[in-house]
């Protein structure tokens, strides 16, 4: 692993290079909007919850590199790159908390074969500058530091960053099995050590899970052999999973659980056929009542953002051109709509926003074009 501070000193000049001439529409943007990064060189740009740091993944000598900048000065604070001998390279990540950044790596498991994402993950601490591997696709022990206890294998998915617990995150581990696997297991993962503490079994084979903001409610959906979806939920204090009484005639992609733990939102298709419209729906956990929030029609690249109370704020999608539907008008949805008007015909996506909504990062692009990042 190599620190790249010396290699990316010119980065500041790149960041401050204005490219407003790239689009006549940019002149309509407020002065607080600045071109941040050139999309051909950088990706996975995000701002930390406090707004203090900006992170990105860049290519340096064909190696994926994590770079963390100070938001105020736009100077490089830290960077991480792995060399060829390490057999891994940084692929992407996100902020866990104000000072913790979790990132994934691609693993070269066989010489001459393209590196793959097997779920290997690291945590980098901006306070201590400590880099900790928290997950390895070959498996890890329940007590990682002492290499004791049962060894756990599989794919690790983050369920919740546990806003009231700075030391742990909630994760689900799905064992690697050719036939679809066994039920996933839910653990608490200690960020400083990578140690795992078992919480509960998942409700069904192949189940995917979501939590509300506090992780007080977990909702799971699992595919069945007849191509339908079954649903379950479990709240803090429950000793077992509860079936949700609903017969959904198709696949369901869960998106969010409301903060009060009463509703789960997701995308589905209830009609048959390859051109069936896609729906944003809500499902009441206790009654199983499903309501359609929005019918998108037969479209692509649907993205739904959630706001106050964990309910939909706005959605964007691609039909004959990029479109937006605002469900609850707030600062974020207003800024996104403004960007879409300024960049008519381009895909606009919000990639990150800090807790105070004072810093928002946007990507503006189109099919076949990497595009550009902007910070508002």
PLM segments and residue spans:
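Bacterial N-terminal signal peptides
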Residues: 12-21
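Bacterial N-terminal signal peptides that target proteins for export
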Residues: 2-12
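Pre-Walker A segment
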Residues: 372-376
């Amino acid at each position: 692993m190599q620190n790249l501070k010396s290699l990316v000193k010119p980065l500041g000049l790149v960041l401050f290079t204005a490219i407003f001439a790239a689009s006549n529409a940019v002149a309509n943007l407020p002065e607080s909007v600045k071109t941040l990064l050139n999309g051909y060189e950088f990706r996975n740009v995000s701002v930390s919850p406090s707004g203090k740091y900006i992170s990105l993944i860049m290519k340096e000598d064909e190696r994926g590199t994590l770079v963390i900048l100070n938001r105020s000065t736009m100077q490089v604070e830290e960077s991480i790159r792995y060399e060829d001998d390490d057999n891994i390279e940084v692929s992407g990540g996100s902020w866990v908390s104000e000072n913790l950044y979790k990132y994934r790596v691609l693993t070269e498991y066989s010489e001459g074969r393209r590196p793959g994402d097997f779920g290997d993950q690291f945590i980098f601490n901006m306070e201590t500058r400590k880099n900790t591997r928290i997950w390895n696709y070959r498996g890890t022990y329940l007590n990682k530091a002492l290499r004791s206890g049962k060894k756990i294998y599989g794919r690790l998915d983050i369920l919740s960053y546990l806003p009231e617990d700075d030391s742990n995150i909630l994760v689900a581990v799905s064992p690697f099995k050719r036939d679809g696997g066994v039920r996933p297991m839910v653990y608490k993962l200690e960020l400083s050590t990578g140690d795992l503490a078992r919480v509960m079994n998942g409700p069904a084979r192949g189940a995917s899970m979501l939590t509300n903001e506090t992780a007080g409610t977990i909702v799971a959906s699992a595919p069945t052999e007849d191509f339908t979806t079954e649903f379950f939920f479990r709240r803090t204090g429950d000793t077992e999973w509860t079936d949700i009484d609903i017969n959904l005639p198709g696949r369901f992609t869960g998106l969010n659980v409301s903060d009060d733990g009463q509703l789960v939102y997701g995308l589905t298709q209830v009609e048959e056929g390859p051109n069936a419209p896609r729906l944003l729906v809500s499902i009441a956990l206790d009654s199983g009542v499903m309501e359609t929030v929005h019918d998108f029609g037969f479209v692509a690249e649907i993205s739904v953002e959630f706001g106050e109370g964990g309910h939909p704020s706005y959605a964007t999608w691609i039909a004959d051109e990029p479109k937006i539907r605002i469900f609850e008008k707030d600062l974020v949805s207003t800024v996104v709509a403004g960007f879409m008007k300024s960049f008519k015909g381009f895909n606009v996506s919000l990639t990150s926003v800090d807790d105070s909504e004072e810093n928002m990062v946007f990507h503006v692009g189109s099919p076949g074009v990497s595009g550009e990042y902007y910070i508002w």
